[in-house]
């Protein structure tokens, strides 16, 4: 089955202080998204779509695009590589973008910018998160089942495996019904493991709501 990996890499990186999507971290200078790409190719994905800012094109091609285009898929075919620009030209006519808006909108805006490059089952991920090899195998298998129905799926993670002792994180807390289906995702902004061993949302204060370690959360892997 042909399937596309759509990578959202147009984030401004303002909290990080630069373009964390293209900072090398591996032994040979690999950037974080390369680990996702290689895991996806091994799982069976055949196409990679980068959603970027226009001024990132040369940087992305030099760091990832050129050698990725030379790689083969699991079936021995060339990997198809595309670049979609996240700008306001894709915003629907019924919405007026504020004149002083510079920063791109979120996930839906990113996907709108990539729609002309996606004509097969696809998944969308963040450029600056690590998802693990097994996650790509799992979601590729699910895509194979869902391809005809047009339905969607998501890879979820236990909250305890996605928080950091070095600061707060934002996670999409998943609310799942008795049938194991996702009802909704609530974005929660200041999750942190506290000194008493409990994970809390400390947005309002240090004694905020407690979340169970196994609470399913979204890392934006749809």
Give the ranges of each region predicted by the language model.
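Short beta-strand segments
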Residues: 8-9, 82-84, 124-126, 154-158
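Short, flexible active-site-adjacent loop segments at beta-strand->alpha-helix junctions, enriched
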Residues: 87-89, 128, 158, 180
